[in-house]
């Protein structure tokens, strides 16, 4: 795993977490130059080019576009096609399935701007979706366009861009419903100014929500009807998940300037195997049923465990990723509940890890951490 320079079409910006349109500016520029297909109004790229940007491919010039999302092609096609209509898009899935990652790259490819984001929380107010006021100017001048503070959604409406609403089901239900008029009428009344803002062609909304959040602030049927829903699955196979983890770890290594380590595919494969077996409640060979922990054991968490292990190996180890470097991260991810998860993890260690050939070092490292 190298951390010296980008190995794909990404651009080194020097930023800790550059936006997608900054990091992949070179790829977006190459795609725009090679794209001669019809583009929907206000789109930077055609749907074909957006799909190529997301899934990767080789252009006629020989330029290679790196894949941003690994998953069923048809789901991505449906997502892109939805945004070419007047229907909003809801990306639904368990934590760690890449919903936010995909929404960011969709906005970057379509609008060249992934920053028009409403981050949903239990404290999100209606102003975050509609508009607010600069109260100093409001008191001094009264309601005026200059005193109006645009929300990301309002900015997207005026500019014909894609707005993102993250964690939609965490937003209070009455605030969620402020989206209904925007999505159905494509207009936002501003009664204080006696006017309304009508959306420019190209405006749309991508929202994300976790399956496990359903019931916290359930979407109203009226709001749900305004969305086309695409359910993002967990990686279908161990090899697919391994490819995702390996690639994202390499990308993070470049972004964080982590020290260069020798390839550690076997150790990453072991982390992926542990996560998949605990998540699915069954060993990979189908012979042993397991208790699943209370956590999600997501791909995103596996990426975090491996990345943290690389830092431990580089700064406090011998420069090689070993079981002892990932053990603490795995235990911390599995054991969320001090009672049920401890029993689940102990069962896995004794029934699976202890008996599996080649896992003795991993078993000892995890037992040491679990004491």
Residue ranges and their predicted role:
Residues 2-257:
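AAA+ P-loop NTPase catalytic core and its hallmark functional loops
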Residues 46, 125, 149, 164, ...:
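A diffuse structural propensity rather than consistent per-protein peaks
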Residues 86, 113, 140, 186, ...:
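Amphipathic alpha-helical interaction segments
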Residues 314-371:
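C-terminal engagement/docking regions of AAA+ P-loop ATPases
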């Amino acid at each position: 795993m190298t951390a010296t320079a980008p190995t794909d079409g990404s651009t080194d910006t020097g930023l800790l977490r550059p936006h997608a349109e900054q990091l992949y500016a070179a790829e977006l520029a190459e795609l725009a130059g090679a794209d001669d297909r019809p583009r929907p109004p206000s789109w930077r790229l055609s749907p074909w080019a957006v799909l190529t940007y997301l899934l990767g491919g080789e252009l006629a010039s020989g330029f290679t576009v790196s894949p941003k999302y690994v998953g069923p092609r048809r789901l991505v096609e449906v997502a892109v096609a939805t945004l070419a209509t007047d229907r909003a898009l809801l990306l639904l899935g368990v934590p760690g399935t890449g919903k936010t990652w995909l929404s960011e790259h969709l906005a970057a490819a379509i609008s060249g701007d992934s920053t028009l984001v409403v981050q949903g929380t239990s404290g999100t107010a209606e102003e975050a979706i509609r508009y607010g006021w600069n109260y100093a100017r409001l008191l001094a001048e009264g309601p005026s366009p200059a005193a109006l503070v645009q929300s990301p959604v309002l900015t997207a409406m005026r500019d014909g861009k894609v707005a993102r609403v993250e964690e939609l089901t965490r937003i209070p239900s009455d605030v969620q419903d402020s989206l209904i008029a925007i999505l159905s009428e494509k207009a936002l009344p501003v009664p204080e100014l006696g006017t309304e803002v009508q959306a420019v062609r190209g405006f749309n909304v991508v929202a994300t929500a976790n399956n496990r959040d359903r019931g916290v602030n359930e979407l109203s049927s009226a709001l749900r009807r305004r969305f086309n829903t695409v359910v993002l699955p967990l990686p279908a196979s161990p090899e697919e998940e391994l490819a995702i983890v390996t690639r994202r770890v390499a990308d993070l290594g470049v972004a964080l300037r982590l020290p260069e380590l020798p390839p550690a595919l076997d150790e990453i494969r072991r982390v992926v195997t542990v996560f998949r077996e605990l998540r699915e409640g069954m060993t990979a060979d189908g012979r042993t049923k397991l208790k699943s922990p209370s956590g999600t054991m997501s791909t995103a968490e596996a990426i975090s465990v491996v990345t943290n292990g690389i830092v431990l190996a580089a700064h406090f180890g011998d420069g090689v990723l070993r079981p002892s470097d990932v053990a603490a991260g795995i235990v911390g991810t599995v054991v969320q509940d001090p009672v049920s998860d401890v029993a689940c993890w102990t069962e896995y260690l004794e029934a699976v890890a202890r008996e599996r050939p080649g896992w003795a070092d991993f078993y000892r490292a995890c037992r040491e951490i679990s004491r």
